[in-house]
A protein has these predicted regions:
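Short acidic/histidine-rich active-site segments
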Residues: 171-176
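N-terminal capping/small domains of soluble enzymes
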Residues: 1-26
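Conserved hydrophobic beta-strand within the GNAT/NAT acetyltransferase core sheet
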Residues: 20, 147-149
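Core AdoMet radical
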Residues: 16-23, 51-59
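C-terminal helical cap(s) of enzyme catalytic domains, especially alpha/beta-barrels
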Residues: 181-198
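Short gly/pro/ser/thr-enriched loop/turn and capping motifs at secondary-structure boundaries
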Residues: 46-49, 177-182
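Alpha/beta enzyme core
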Residues: 8, 25-52, 61-78, 86-147, ...
Length: 198
């Protein structure tokens, strides 16, 4: 399985840390056994996406992530808490900034090493991004915040720039803009690494 592939990677050969994306406690246990030093858990800013992507509510996903966070701290593993549909959800519509702010505060307080805002369906615009990230940087500082943008509406790079203006310096990206979301029809891949690097 994926855990065997991860365990066989020569991680020292990578310029950046390898990160295991885990869906639940079983995923955490497999990642830990495979030698993962950093894991990413997905949280949700809407119940619609939580149900479609993980067959659970937002509250259930939060509780599982908090439990994994406690274990990871004991195990010396870093945790990235990624908040999906931080700007809009294909099932529930626009996401209230207050929902995202509460989620970020909860996981910052719980000790997440990073909290990432994910524009899962690529619906955000620079004005939204600038407003939300500026507020969050003011509340928590920029050091543990990051962003994850999809380029569905060709706004990904503009959204990166808006977040940079707020002080964010950590971004997810993918080679040649690969990626997508199986539960977000029409959503394209992530912002391309080569575009961000330029």
């Amino acid at each position: 399985g994926t855990d065997q592939v991860f365990a066989s990677l020569e991680k020292a050969q990578f310029a950046t840390p390898t990160i295991a994306l885990i869906p639940n406690m079983k995923g955490y246990e497999l990642a830990r056994a495979a030698g993962a030093k950093t894991v990413t858990m997905v949280l949700y800013a809407s119940d619609g996406m939580a149900q479609k992507n993980a067959s659970m509510s937002m509250a259930q996903a939060d509780e599982i992530t908090l439990e994994i966070l406690r274990l990871a701290k004991q195990d010396g593993i870093e945790v990235i808490a990624t908040i999906a549909v931080a700007f809009a959800c294909p099932f529930d519509g626009p996401t209230a900034a207050s929902t995202v702010e509460k989620g970020v505060a909860r996981f910052m307080k719980a000790g997440a090493d990073q909290v990432v805002l994910a524009d899962t369906i690529g619906a955000a615009d620079p004005q939204q991004v600038r407003a939300l990230t500026a507020t969050l940087v003011e509340q928590h500082g920029a050091g543990r915040l990051g962003c994850h943008f999809h380029d569905t509406r060709a706004m990904g790079l503009a959204n990166v720039y808006a977040a940079v203006e707020s002080g964010i310096r950590r971004f997810d990206s993918s080679i040649a803009g690969l990626g997508g979301c199986p539960f977000a029809p029409g959503a394209s891949g992530n912002v391309a690494t080569d575009d961000i690097a330029m």
